[in-house]
Amino acid sequence: MNSKLLYRIGIVAMSAMLAVAVYLALVFYPILVESAEEDIDVVFRALFPFISIFIAPVAGLVLYLRKKPAGLTLCAGYAIFMTAASVFCIGLTEFNVANVLTVILYLASAVVYLLPQSRFSFAPDSSPVDNALNSLMWAVLLVFIVIGPVLLPARYIGMIVGLVLLLLVLRGFVGLKK
């Protein structure tokens, strides 16, 4: 597969995730708010994901279409958030499994197209700082994706997404200095 095809796959996958986000917002948000009544914790858990649903994918997709690195960072954070939120808040259904597969497809195509392969490998010629950042980034991502949705309250997911985004941005700056 060439990079142009991978870029197009990324656009299609991100657009599909935006459609999924809008669908989830239209279907589940009124149910969550109605069931919350006066419980502020439930209202917070309902509001935070849906705010990100309308801001992050639109901004990320626009940046991605303009081939800006910030688009990848924003979309990757959104994809991780949506995957975790789908599993944590709604549970595994056929619809959510399709959403997770779309997330994986998007991330794979975006990473292959926009980032040099050396940034995600442990090459002998890489500096110890590069290898340490690679290890830290993958460890945070794996812990967040696998353990985060099970152990953490929904309000902390945003903080972890922020940490992941920060790591990705820092990793990008280190890579640009080469």
Please tell me what each predicted stretch does:
Residues M1-K178:
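Topology signature of small-to-medium multi-pass alpha-helical membrane proteins
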